[in-house]
Amino acid sequence: LSFAVRELGCIAGINITASHNPPEYNGYKVYWEDGAQFTPPHDKGVLEEVLAIEDLSTVKTTSEEEALRSGKFQVIGKEIDDKYIENVKAQVVNQDAIDRMQKDITIIYTPLHGTGNIPARRVMKELGFENVYVVPEQELPDGNFPTVSYPNPEAEEAFALGLKLAKEKNADLVLATDPDADRLGVYVKDAKTGEYHPLTGNMSGSLLCDYVLGQKQAKGLEKQAEAEEKAAETGAKETFVYAAVDPDRAYGFVAVAAG
């Protein structure tokens, strides 16, 4: 949805979802024209408009036929999915590393009965990862979330079936997305003990930042002088200096110092 809003030049996007909440809940997520969820003052403005409605009969409506005819309503198809997948794949910073390791890494994935199954597995397949297994009990969409009480990939309970399958397959990585696929949980295997450990959001973010910056540094795409020039142009008050142990590793964070 975030991608489609920007790609199609929409002023907003709406997702009817309870996200990672229990099945008795429902919800309403609104995205602004930048593809991000509403923030002040837009959220307040929308709420004020809703509260101003005294009678639903006064709300202006139009028929689906008229909306289609006027171009205000469009049913998006596979072309948006394809563009989104290509955009995600374009974010890869080291395809060579993937090519070297894709046959040696085993990944367990669960969409937790939600919408992530097709796009997540498609991206991994098209990038070349061959050993990807989905948790069968949680593969298909089901708003009742029968295998978990709380489909939040931050909760240990949500990983129970994924970790069980990971041990059976001797997997290296366990991934879970929440039902509307905008939240990611990660477990990694300790190569020494064979135990699986969760990564917090802060850990995952730090590792991603470390890896992307390490790849850019290794390829000479971001010289310090260039970074300082960009910082000056954008009004940034701090410059960040990065040091990596091994640019081919997605871990090994050493230091990020403000200067």
Task: Name these PLM-found stretches.
Residues 1-11, 155-172:
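Conserved phosphate-binding catalytic cores of ATP/NTP-utilizing and phosphoryl-transfer enzymes
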Residues 21-24, 115-117, 141-144, 181-185, ...:
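Flexible loop/turn segments at secondary-structure boundaries
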Residues 26-160, 165-166, 225, 231:
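Gly/Ser/Thr-enriched, mixed-charge loops and adjacent short helices
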Residues 54-79, 190-259:
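Proline/glycine-rich low-complexity loops and linkers
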